[in-house]
Regions:
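Residue-level signature of outer-membrane beta-barrel architecture
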Residues: 1-2, 15, 73, 87, ...
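Residues that define the transmembrane beta-barrel architecture of outer-membrane proteins
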Residues: 63-67, 123-127, 164-170, 239-243, ...
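Gram-negative outer-membrane beta-barrel transporters
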Residues: 86-89, 101, 106-197
Length: 300
């Protein structure tokens, strides 16, 4: 809706469904890569909501209702602002059952589904706001965005923040083209993100695997190292931030042929951002250090 020539309002809403589930564990300290599997059909028959109501699970499809609204405003001929708010209401989400205690067999038929199924139903919400400022004039381009997000989940027993709940995120991008035919381009990008949730390690213990023999002597067996986890996702990882710089020089051979040389510097101030944490060895692995690189391309 064009309120004026400089002010616009926009909104959208929809109901979405999918039949995929992430193939990763929220017990990992850091999750940067995701695989996806088809969602399972063997789910609990009922789901207890956060307010205590019990509803039937009619099918395995995951569903969410999305609502987005925002305004765009042209502050000047070269500077514009975009502000959006959103709400995602996750009505039914499939997740691994971290509360499982029993096998899903006839022996435990009287136990509740929430304690024996491999997967459970969850619900939750994600809401937040995005503010974007964009400046374009001649060969200058500046782009700044701030995002605030809050995500929670309810698994039938407790409310918690999932591992992708990042409260604050900032992106700053700048580029400038100069020289004959704008043959030179320089660019910079800085990103800041507050820490993701993770579950702390509370303790370790030796897990003895019994073989079913009543004469089994557990005192002479070799135990496996097992972990006692702390409260679900009540820890927060360190903040993430990184600066990347780049320069591009192009040579136009004719209308259809261009040679480009790219020089870049990743993580320019050598920030130590966490990549992985080994709970057992209590060792941290960081992401890329300061990394220079170059590339040469030919386009025709």
């Amino acid at each position: 809706w064009n309120i004026t020539d400089d002010l616009r309002f926009k909104a959208s809403a929809g109901r979405y469904s999918q039949n995929l589930v992430a193939a990763n564990s929220d017990r990992d300290v850091v999750n940067l890569f995701y695989g996806f599997l088809s969602a399972p059909d063997n789910l609990p028959k009922t789901f207890t909501t956060a307010n205590g109501d019990v509803r039937d699970v009619k099918d395995p499809l995951q569903r969410a209702n999305h609502v987005v609204a925002g305004i765009e405003y042209d502050i000047t001929d070269h500077l514009s602002a975009n502000f959006e708010v959103y709400l995602k209401d996750f009505r039914q989400v499939t997740n691994l059952n971290r509360n499982k205690l029993f096998n899903d067999t006839d022996e435990f038929a009287d136990e509740p589904d929430e304690l024996k199924k491999d997967y459970i139903i969850e619900s939750g919400q994600a809401y937040g706001a995005d503010l974007l400022l964009k400046y374009e004039k001649n060969n200058y381009y500046l782009w700044a965005v701030y995002s605030y997000t809050y995500v929670d989940r309810w698994d039938g027993f407790r409310s918690y923040n999932p591992v992708w709940d990042r409260r604050n995120n900032i992106n700053l991008v700048a580029s400038y083209a100069f020289g004959k035919f704008d043959a030179w381009k320089v660019n910079a990008r800085w990103n800041f993100g507050s820490g993701f949730p993770f579950t702390k390690t509370q303790s370790y213990y030796g897990s003895t695997q019994y073989n079913g023999d009543v004469n089994y002597d557990y005192t002479t067996s070799n135990s496996n190292l097992a972990i006692i986890f702390g409260p679900l996702n009540e820890g927060r990882l360190p903040t993430y931030h990184r600066l990347d710089l780049g320069v591009t020089k192009s040579w136009r051979l004719d209308e259809n042929q261009v040679v480009e040389l790219d020089l870049s510097l990743t993580n320019a101030y050598d920030r130590q951002n966490i990549f992985y944490f080994d709970r057992v060895r209590f060792e941290r692995v960081d992401q890329l250090p300061l990394l220079p690189s170059f590339g040469l391309s030919y386009k025709f």
